[in-house]
Amino acid sequence: MKLPRLLYFHFSSNAINSVEFDRGKILSMSAQLIPVSDNGAAQSRRRVPRHVGFIPDGNRRWAVQNGLAKEKGYENGIAPGVALFEACKTLGIEEVSVFGFTQDNTRRPVAQSDHFRAACVVFAHEISRRGAALLVLGDEQSPQFPVELAQFRTRQGEGIKVNFLVNYGWEWDLDGLKEGGLRSAEVSRLDLIVRWGGGRRLSGFLPVQSVYADIFVIEELWPDFHPQHLEAALSWLEQQDPTLGG
């Protein structure tokens, strides 16, 4: 049976202009990304982090390198995200946090912001269908926040915890202290952060939870994700000494 194409077109203050993604293509692409195996090497891992953060950078650069408009990179980043989610489930990771887009990102051209917002909607609903206990964290009062994700502003589901940062800003997060607590208070301390695209920075990614996190950088661009990237990050983490400042 042919899966329907996904069309997002809304008449509201935070409308996403007409952006169409082919769900069948996305699912086919994610299925081709072989998940991290649960063989003896994975099962004998001495240190499986409880909470891992992911910064999937390089969508626009990937699009340009492949002769596409920059906004097309975001669609090609959905399937890797689904495959990464499945790999984390297989490994028994309890909680993951994923950068969708930041408040600063919304300054990009409209075509790009429409596409990354729509891509976030597709990804969020797909992992929710796959059993994620999903929390979308970001400024929902802004017109840049996709209305389709409002239902996930309180955590939904009972599986692996996924904190999806959508229209997130570190200042917005910390401003919650004026009202009694971090806006990300429900998110636990990070053990490991993995960033694609070669950047050596956190870009405001959960600054409080990141305080003792080890950081692993992957040079490949996000749409070129392969499960071996995650395996490499976890193997590297086993060699680190988690002193937590002690």
Task: Label each region the model flagged.
Residues 26-246:
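Flexible, compositionally biased loop and terminal segments
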Residues 1-31:
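N-terminal amphipathic/basic-hydrophobic helices that include classical n-h-c signal peptides
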